[in-house]
Amino acid sequence: MRRILLSLLLLYSVTVFCQPAGVTLDTLHIKHIDFQGKTQTGVLICNQKIADDLQEIFAELYKAKYPIERIRPISEYQDDDERSMRANNTSCYCYRVVEGSKTLSNHARGLAIDVNPLYNPCVRRKKDGTILIQPDTGKPYVNRAKAFKYKITKDDLCYRLFIQHGFKWGGNWRTVKDYQHFEKPDL
């Protein structure tokens, strides 16, 4: 059943034919608490190698009533990562390159996930010195010293659970700060 659902979801994705060789994707149905405090069931497409970790992490987040606005496949946003992030959509698989490079992102292998990306933007300095914020609507949440809801920090349950499961956090990177991003790049 999960394979059939995955096939149907990917049917509408322009990136389905770009899936890297040797990558097996899985579809997870993830219970979560939305920003209105209601239980929702989201759909997460990920690499089969991290499926069990993600199920355990999100089960703990759900039990703790940790708010996640939405969890939908990137195909619901016409494979547009910026559009998905602006909608504060938590997602995993997205066939794309790392911004500003020709290198495949770990999202393209389903080994990376972005959680509540609007409130936890990716911030990078481009070669011309300008600052790139993704999503572009995440500018109010760049200053991590400010107090605001849904912010991932090292004290946050979301951070702790992903780290306990062996993920690396983009908020710890030196040059780019990708506060929404967790990955297992070495699988």
Locate the predicted segments by residue.
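Positively charged n-region of N-terminal signal peptides that target proteins for export
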Residues: 1-4
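Boundary at the C-terminal end of the N-terminal hydrophobic targeting segment
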Residues: 16-18
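Extracellular/periplasmic catalytic domains that process cell-envelope and extracellular macromolecules
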Residues: 21-24, 104-110, 163
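Active-site acidic/histidine clusters and adjacent loop/turn architecture
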Residues: 22-85
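Surface-exposed patches in mature extracellular/periplasmic domains of secreted proteins
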Residues: 65-76, 104, 169-176
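Mid-length scaffold segments of soluble, non-membrane domains
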Residues: 83-118
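Catalytic cores and adjacent binding grooves of peptidoglycan-active enzymes
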Residues: 98-100, 113-187
